[in-house]
């Protein structure tokens, strides 16, 4: 099945915790059918930047409808996998924004680590990681 365009509006920061609890905890099944575990400590991490809180809904969209998944590009985190997506704020948004979700592969499944809009130079670095999965066009 071809990838669906990811159209997800920004959420209100005041709704972030409710959305986090409803959409992501205790786990999400990703595009490959794997379980990604999410816990309250992950929300504390996301709270560090308002931009991340406004994009809670983008985390679910990126885990379930990514453009690609790559192995981590950093030698110190060989167990990291990164979901890459372009998310559009509305049907009228023609550019969208890149969005990445990082998870760590553990013994029991995948553990959520982070999610953010990467700088273009950092996205280039992420894309140096080995391709694990790619959406069909």
Give residue ranges: language-model regions.
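Ribonuclease/tRNase effector modules and their secretory precursors
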Residues: 1-137
């Amino acid at each position: 099945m071809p990838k669906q365009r990811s159209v997800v509006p920004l959420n209100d920061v005041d709704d972030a915790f409710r959305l986090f609890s409803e959409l992501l905890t205790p786990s999400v099944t990703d595009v490959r059918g794997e379980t990604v575990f999410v816990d309250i400590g992950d929300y504390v991490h996301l709270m560090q930047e308002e931009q991340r809180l406004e994009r809670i809904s983008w985390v679910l969209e990126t885990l379930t409808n990514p453009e690609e998944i790559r192995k981590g590009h950093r030698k110190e985190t060989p167990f990291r996998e990164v979901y890459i997506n372009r998310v559009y704020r509305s049907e009228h948004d023609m550019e969208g924004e890149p969005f990445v979700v990082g998870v760590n592969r553990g013994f029991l499944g995948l553990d959520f680590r982070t999610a953010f809009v990467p700088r273009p130079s950092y996205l280039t670095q992420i894309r140096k990681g080995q391709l694990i999965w790619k959406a069909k066009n």
